[in-house]
Regions:
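Non-catalytic scaffold segments within catalytic domains of secreted glycoside hydrolases
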Residues: 1-218
């Protein structure tokens, strides 16, 4: 990537690469200083090199710099957003890749979640979290040092790229209500049960008529 962006920058008339290189002194200064590897992950893409179609993307741009075509298979059906197609094996594979590539660092999953267009009975999100958490456990069994996991997100929010059109929250936010009422989705009950029992029960069905509370000690 460093060489590719340098070559593209020269061809585009830049005096130097748009991706500044670290000096040897800077590399030495930061080497070994990280406490953990923070990972945001949502889904998986199939990727292949595409140097033969230089006008596929705007120039210069992130996508043009990659020189790749990315796509997802039609059987990855669950998910209203391409960013959150259900591919749990890709999560396990990525965790193993990072572990092997970077000398087995502690990995903190800082974002992982699923987008819908709203609704309380979010069965697809429940399927997603169960599948991805099982994949994470498989990666731990593989020897990956996972030290933490954060679900994205606690409640619906304004997403950088898609505004309010995609909902990631465990809690649904009513944006038509001036009080922005929050209501727990089924996924909130399921994740609470996973944390309470420290296990993933594929058959657990919550009673959503009961209020979702924080239990003492859980």
């Amino acid at each position: 990537m460093i060489r590719r962006i340098a070559d593209k920058s020269a061809a585009q008339g830049f005096l130097r690469s748009r991706l500044p290189e670290l000096t040897s002194e800077e590399v030495k200064l930061i080497q070994g200083t990280s406490d953990f590897f923070g990972l945001n992950h949502y889904s998986t893409y199939i990727v292949y090199r595409n140097e033969s179609a230089p006008e596929t993307y705007p120039v210069p741009s992130y996508d043009d710099d990659l020189d790749t075509i990315q796509y997802q298979l039609p059987e990855w059906k669950i998910g209203s957003s391409n960013a959150t197609k259900y591919v749990p094996w890709g999560f396990r594979s990525l965790l193993n890749y990072i572990s092997h590539q970077y000398d087995y660092p502690p990995i903190l999953v800082t974002e992982n979640g699923f987008a819908t267009h709203g609704g309380i009975n979010d069965e697809d999100r429940v399927t997603y979290y169960r599948g991805y958490l099982n994949a994470l456990l498989d990666a731990i069994d593989d020897g990956v040092d996972v030290i933490g996991y954060t679900a994205w997100s606690l409640m619906d929010n304004f997403e950088w790229a898609n505004g309010y059109t995609e909902r990631f929250g465990l809690y649904e936010v009513d944006y038509n209500d001036p009080n922005r009422t929050r209501t727990p989705r089924k996924s909130a009950y399921v994740l609470k049960e996973i944390m309470r029992t420290r296990s993933i029960d594929p058959n657990y069905e919550p009673d959503m008529n009961q209020p979702l509370t924080i239990d003492h000690g859980h």
